């Protein structure tokens, strides 16, 4: 009897929760968003971890299938992918976001100016992730209808 009640309660909670997700998706619709990271992560990469959490919260609210998210990284923001080489929590966050089709666009000017090799110095960056200019990429994406967010 108790088992049956628990089963019914769990089923009800699942149905109710799916209604909230559906309602949120209906509210927000399809979105194209660019997140801008050009700052240092601070102590224990707290600012970077906070930015990754903001992006995940956005995905949770709208649904990955309704989002196209790009993270443009330049200047001191390059530290997010440098730190992810050694900070397992940050690495896990970046990998999780990438698995949800979030792309990380890295500024070539920053790589050159900071003398960084993206293959050796940064976590999970490939040639196709490099953009000529982070700032120009931000402008370009906004012209294409991406909403700008700086976490």
Feature roles, as predicted:
Residues 1-9:
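Bacterial N-terminal signal peptides that target proteins for export
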Residues 68-81, 110-111:
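Acidic helix-start/capping segments at beta-turn-to-alpha-helix junctions
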Residues 16-26:
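Bacterial Sec-dependent signal peptides at the C-terminal "C-region" and cleavage site
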